[in-house]
Amino acid sequence: MKTPAVGIKNAPPGLHSPQSYDMMKLRLVLILLLFAASAGILAWLYGAATRPPRTAKASPWTETLADLDACCRRKHVKSVLYDNFATIAAGENRPEAERLFRAMAYSERLQEHNCAEAILHLGGSYTPPVRIVLFGGTTDDNLERSIAYEHRGLRERHGAEIGRAMRKGNRYAARILVRASALDLRNAVLMERCLHTGKHSPDSCRFFVCPECGNIYAAERLDYYCPLCFTGNERFVQF
């Protein structure tokens, strides 16, 4: 009896072609790779779950940002109060006091803007205070209250915020804070003079404010350039 030849086409079950062996090997390799990948993922998940939480890196400007934020808020509150005091002075026919309060309010807004820009530059954020208590009283009362507030703030801070910025090597923030402190003192001096001259003084004093840094003058003869930021006096705003 003649035995038929076994070939690819008529091979009995159980006999496989070389291509079938290759497919089986490839499938086995894929299974091993998937197993290894799964094991790696599980190991990573376990490590992530048991790893202690990573603490966020603190900003090197935390103290400086807090000082700038506090300065911004003071300036914002004073600008609102001074505008209110100017309205009261106008009602009492105190034109010099009205102009002074208007000039100081404008100066405070400029300083607030500069402080807020410094905060953003250092990676922080600033939101102005919403609720501000407005005082009434006479113009002389408001002058006395404002003078006391400026002097008290200067005594309490005694330049500490400037020193902190300098020790951190942040001369940009220190410059903003130096200007703010200097203008607080300037405001107090101008208000003391206005309170001293009283309501019967001649209406002759005019005030000028540098539109860049908020430096304020009470003089007819001005510096050619603002000594704080070098802005030309032709740009000064008159009140």
Which residues fall in each region the model found?
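Non-heme di-metal
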Residues: K25-F239
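N-terminal hydrophobic targeting signals that begin at the initiator methionine
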Residues: K2, M24-K25
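Polybasic, lysine-rich low-complexity intrinsically disordered segments
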Residues: K2-T3, N10
